[in-house]
């Protein structure tokens, strides 16, 4: 109880502790005694290396970290492993007072583990869960805006390059049945936004993750089909960067031969060659809102209505 000590006595105690190499109470023991860890768990849908290569995720994470750090909380990262999310035992062992889930599939087992522990939960993007705090953007509206822009330019032959519909590692063309049963709300909404303008017969290439390498392969496959699309709608900027490379691989030019639109507006978009046209979503703001919701739940607040940010 340092408040009951004189300043001089407190200073002597601290000097003695420092000379003995005592750094203070053991954090694990302290958390057991107080039943609080001052930590926010962050559940990822993929491994750490893939996550840190995702520019959009990095910006969201920065917004979240800056918010909780300002209230003396730390972040505990729980990388995805099985079926698009952390293993349940990872969640069970994690020292966290509240959990933020980032883009997990609807049936991620990690979500059941969070509920079993009775921890407050905040969702960024997906899944949609009842009575759960959530931050999202208008994915359908943003995708529809992108497709409408290209339609207004006169394009009628489209191709779509998207990230995963299911956490099963599939790369290839999407069948109507696979589209109808997708496990990811964001993927579903963006595809519905695109196809609402271009038509349900538009070819859609699925990439197992949002990466330039897979976007390049998917775009190349679409651009070598007959008839060749004159416009590609990419569900992320990372996929769009890969599509730009595929266009160069085939000796084509943007926008003379093919138009490309991404989604995210990461900083690298304006430095691409040519600069990438993209749908902007407020990534840092999304992370900050999630952090504010997590802190509110820790203070006993209610989840409230989902927060939808404009694109």
Give names to the regions the model predicted.
Residues 46-59, 79-85, 135-144, 161-218, ...:
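Hinge/beta->alpha junction and helix N-cap segments in small-molecule ligand-binding domains
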Residues 20, 93, 153-155, 222-228:
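Glycine-rich phosphate-binding loop signature in dinucleotide/nucleotide-binding domains
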Residues 216, 220-311:
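Flexible loop/turn connectors
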Residues 107-112, 116-118, 152-155, 159-167, ...:
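A charged, well-structured terminal subsegment
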Residues 35, 39-152:
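Alpha-helical recognition/docking segments in bacterial nutrient-uptake
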Residues 16, 63-67, 113, 189-197, ...:
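Alpha-helical structural signal in soluble globular domains
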Residues 156-157, 201-202, 254-260:
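Short acidic capping loops at alpha-helix termini that bridge into adjacent secondary structure
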């Amino acid at each position: 109880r340092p408040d009951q000590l004189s300043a001089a006595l407190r200073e002597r105690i601290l000097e003695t502790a420092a000379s003995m190499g005592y750094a203070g109470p053991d954090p694990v023991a302290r958390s057991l005694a107080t039943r609080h860890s001052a930590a926010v768990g962050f559940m990822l849908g993929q491994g750490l290396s893939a996550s840190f290569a995702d520019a959009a995720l990095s910006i969201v994470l920065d917004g979240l970290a800056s918010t909780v750090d300002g209230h003396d909380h730390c972040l505990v990262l729980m990388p995805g492993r099985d079926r698009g999310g952390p293993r349940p035992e990872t969640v069970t062992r994690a020292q966290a007072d509240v959990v933020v889930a980032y883009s997990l599939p609807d049936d991620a087992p990690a979500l059941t583990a969070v509920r079993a522990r009775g921890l407050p939960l905040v969702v960024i993007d997906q899944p949609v869960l009842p009575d759960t705090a959530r931050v999202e953007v208008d994915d359908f509206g943003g995708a529809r805006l992108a497709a409408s822009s290209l339609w207004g330019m006169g394009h009628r032959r489209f191709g779509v390059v998207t990230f995963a519909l299911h956490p099963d590692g599939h790369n290839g063309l999407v069948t109507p049945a696979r589209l109808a049963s997708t496990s990811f709300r964001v993927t579903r909404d963006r595809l519905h936004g695109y196809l609402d303008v271009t038509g349900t017969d538009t070819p859609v290439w699925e990439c197992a993750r949002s990466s330039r390498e897979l976007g390049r392969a998917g775009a190349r496959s679409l651009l070598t089909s007959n008839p060749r699309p004159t416009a590609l709608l990419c569900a992320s900027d990372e996929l769009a960067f890969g599509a730009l490379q595929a266009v160069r691989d085939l000796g084509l030019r943007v926008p003379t031969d093919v138009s490309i639109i991404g989604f995210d507006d990461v900083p690298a978009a304006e430095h691409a060659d040519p600069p990438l046209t993209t749908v902007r979503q407020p990534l840092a703001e999304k992370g900050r809102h999630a952090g504010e919701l997590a802190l509110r739940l820790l203070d006993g607040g209610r989840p409230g209505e989902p927060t939808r940010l404009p694109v």
